[in-house]
Amino acid sequence: MKNSLYENCNLCPRNCGVNRFEKTGFCGETSEIKIACGTLHFGEEPPVTALGGSGTIFLTGCNLRCAFCQNYQISQKGMGKTLSADEFADLCLSLESNGAENVNLVTGSHHIPAIAEGLERAKVKGLKIPVCWNSSAYENIEALELLDGLVDIWLPDMKTLNPMISDEVFKAKDYPKVAKKAIRWMMEHSTLKFETVAEKNDKDSVKRHGSSQIEKMISGVIIRHLVLPGRIDDTRLVLDWLKNHADGKACISLMSQYTPVEVSEKDFSKEEIESREKSLQSFQHRLMNQNEFDEIRNLIDEYNFEYLFYQELTSDTDWLPDFNKFQPFSNELSKTIWHWNGER
């Protein structure tokens, strides 16, 4: 039984060996799947958002626990509600019935056995839309294999290939090695496939996408990289690897949205805040500036990837979520279908 893997948990490279039927692992979670919210999200890459929005399920807990995480309320502070496999399946179906283009599972690496069971039940109940796996790529291949045949779209991060940064920021010096292996596996198990879809309400589509038609992803891999301010050379390392190993096999998504998230002793203990601040000294904890963005644009031209998305530079922070609220994101970015603190 898949869930027996929780007894001596080695699902992720932390290999903490905890019996998660009895207590929490490094990820902060037990064997029970916990979810913060389910939304129609319109802020993902265009082929994932498509026209109806991505049916995004934000899971509680995380096996990486980055010091700069914008979702710290759910990734590190345990906010969420426990769901059974059938309840999880019903949430997937609810997102589909509300027009979601896919089911987008955010940060579920530590819940893979329970998620696999839930997805199997959802498909038996009639789930037809693609399933998207949205993760840090800090994952063991043995765990990912449980998702083979259940996931259609892989959306991993490649956060850094600098072991010093990964050690200092998320206490995982082996992250570069692990992420490369996981992403290679994802590319081997999914082929890029798109279909053209047209919006009946042309005005809404043109406003959001600039066109009444869009290419929707059916399967494949999109590899994300968040540029850290002051560490453009690290981004070049990542792009070098991606050019050599992923160009033409996956889409590349460069993100410029790094945003300082302020926390207080209401959120974390004094010791946790001190540890967090020490980790953040590895780079410049600020918004990206125009010079850095220009450098990124030059790198985009230099590497000339076959499939690449990038974010425009902005100082807007309205997109930062608050998972205490029924609508964690702005109304423009998402529509909540289910929330841990009550349905509406």
Where are these regions (language model features)?
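Alpha-helix-loop-beta-strand connector modules within alpha/beta enzyme cores
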Residues: 118-132, 181-189, 292-298
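Glycine-rich S-adenosyl-L-methionine
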Residues: 173-191, 203
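Conserved radical SAM core fold
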Residues: 75, 112, 137-140, 158-176, ...
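Conserved Radical SAM active-site core
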Residues: 23, 27-149, 153-154, 162-163, ...
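Hydrophobic faces of well-ordered beta-strands that scaffold small-molecule active sites
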Residues: 55, 103, 131-133, 154-156, ...
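Aromatic/hydrophobic pocket-lining residues that form the small-molecule binding cavity
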Residues: 88, 115, 144, 179, ...
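Alpha-helix N-cap and loop-to-helix initiation/capping positions
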Residues: 83, 110, 170-178, 230, ...
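Auxiliary Fe-S-binding modules of radical SAM enzymes
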Residues: 1-24, 192-344
